[in-house]
Amino acid sequence: MPIRRLPPETVNRIAAGEVVERPASAIKELVDNAIDAGATRIEVEAHGGGLTRILVADDGCGLSAEELPVALERHATSKLAPDAQGLWDLLAIHTMGFRGEALPSIGSVARLSISSRAKGSSDAWSILVEGGSVGDVAPAAFAGDHGARIEVRDLFYATPARLKFMKSERAEALAITEEIKRQAMANESVGFSLDIDGRRIIRLPPEHPGPQGRLARLSAVLGRDFQDNAIEIDQTRDGVRLTGFAGLPTYNRGNAAHQYLFVNGRPVRDRLLQGALRAAYADFLARDRHPTAALYISLDTSEVDVNVHPAKAEVRFRDPALVRGLIVGALRHALAGAGHRASTTTAASALDAIRAQSMVPPGAYSGYQPNAYQGGPSPAGFSAWQAGGWTRPSPQVLPGLSDVSARVEPGGYGVAEAVREAAFGEYDAPPNVAYPGGFSEDPAPVFDPVDFPLGAARAQVHETYIVAQTRDGVVIVDQHAAHERLVYERMKGEMAAGRVARQALLLPEVVELDPAEAERVVARAEELAALGLVIESFGPGAVLVRETPALLGKTDAAGLVRDIADDLAENGQALALKERLEEVCSTMACHGSVRAGRRLTGAEMNALLREMEATPHSGQCNHGRPTYVELKLADIERLFGRR
């Protein structure tokens, strides 16, 4: 079969198949061009799922009459220029586009028209393309001072086979909306609007550059809940900077669709970045739950290759281990700084459920008479408390609480101290200790335990849930989930300090590896020993395992070493061992925690609350479920119609 040269029209259609997969792809390319042109406002319209009509208008620098026909030639672009030696460097790309394929590719499969006025020019021009056939440049009317207006009609009319693979108009419209959302999150200083079939879907004004403007844009796109439950990320390592916002572990989703990743301002879908994000949350989420995040990576253009995918949706890093380590480390540091915070949506969901179950038919209480209750026999173990009808457990029901109550006046300063003594024993200050502010004859300032972040324990419900009162609401704690997290964090702390118990193998095991893999593993011998795995070199391509972590019990040492070798090759870190140890710690913490059904004293409940406040990640258990729910007083009052 002879080799033939393909005609330009066929070449363009082949390129269009790679670059323009669907209407959302065409819009992405046109929006990229607008951003590269310096636009501050971009308007997008779509009809018929983008197949009937697409319009992208911007206020960028525009194109002159001479540039319009050149822009429609393949591989003609304003975004690359030769250096002093006349070389065209594809590793120094600072723009969204650079190949010069978008306009000719779209023009080869659709009816394309471009109207534009160049900045500083009084004249506007237009050009038409139909099925790859380029018309002449002609004068045109243009409303703005400068910019471009690109209209695409009958997308893929020249390639009918492609239309058979399009999804429904609704699905294509959703893809277009998602694309504009990603572009808007990547460029907070640019205003965006999107109309689909004449209906306004998105309208976003420009925001000020910086963290606050970015958070405002993310809130507008992802919702106020994301803003209320996000923590800021800002860390730099070896010239790579990671910024953005990540959701609390308890603010999670059932899929990874709410993970937005950007590299040098470019929206990407990259497995390395998604894997790093997942690894950072591995301690906090169940396997079927996914974190939410909008992360922005900035690095020198020479350290990343964006020319590895036709649609520029994927990138390749020169040092992937550095990028992965930065993401995992920065996210874990930020999550630790979040302390005991839990998602605000947890309480909202609980309130919605309460409202749904508490709908009372009109007139249901028509026969109710205030103060009609005349009293009666009190439940066993309870005594009347004050005149308001409230009851509290008697000392026989909650042993140990009476010891605290006897030493503390109600609402007095010593409540916390008494609780602490009941839980941990009395404490005598050493002599000659200077207290801040000194002592005086004046009475000590009154401190109310409800001022603690998680409040003061008031009751235990069903011997499973702790009810605590805060200054402006109520906190309900799952005692098992909370204590499980506390035990787990304590075990992780011991592991991080290198206090991992080891078990010696009766017969040291030889593991054969590729020589390069064996060298990498042996180079990390000291790090692995701190995690309980003692190895040494056993000649080229072999490793001798002498001791393994006692936590793992009887384990497959050879399989563990091979997994570590794979981790070192791919990520530069021995993640397999850490993950296995943490998984075992999680299981041990679950079985060694306070179980549901155990009755706690008031001192024990308050001690648990105080430890939660001082422990990172205590807002969720090891499986990603919330450990507590906080109901604001205002929300409770709304339930009873007081607001």
From Swiss-Prot:
Output one GO BP term: mismatch repair
Record SUPFAM superfamilies: ATPase domain of HSP90 chaperone/DNA topoisomerase II/histidine kinase, DNA mismatch repair protein MutL, Ribosomal protein S5 domain 2-like
Which UniProt keyword terms apply here? DNA damage, DNA repair
What are the GO cellular component annotations?
mismatch repair complex
InterPro entries the UniProt entry points to: DNA_mismatch_repair_CS, DNA_mismatch_repair_MutL, DNA_mismatch_S5_2-like, HATPase_C_sf, MutL/Mlh/PMS, MutL/Mlh/Pms-like, MutL_C, MutL_C_dimsub
The molecular function terms in GO held by this entry are: ATP binding; ATP hydrolysis activity; ATP-dependent DNA damage sensor activity; mismatched DNA binding
Per the record, the similarity remark reads: Belongs to the DNA mismatch repair MutL/HexB family.
Please give the function described in this protein's UniProt entry. Answer: This protein is involved in the repair of mismatches in DNA. It is required for dam-dependent methyl-directed DNA mismatch repair. May act as a 'molecular matchmaker', a protein that promotes the formation of a stable complex between two or more DNA-binding proteins in an ATP-dependent manner without itself being part of a final effector complex.
The record's NCBIfam families line, in alphabetical order, gives: mutl (TIGR00585), PRK00095.2-4 (NF000953)
UniProt protein name:
DNA mismatch repair protein MutL
Q: Which organism is it from?
A: Caulobacter sp. (strain K31)
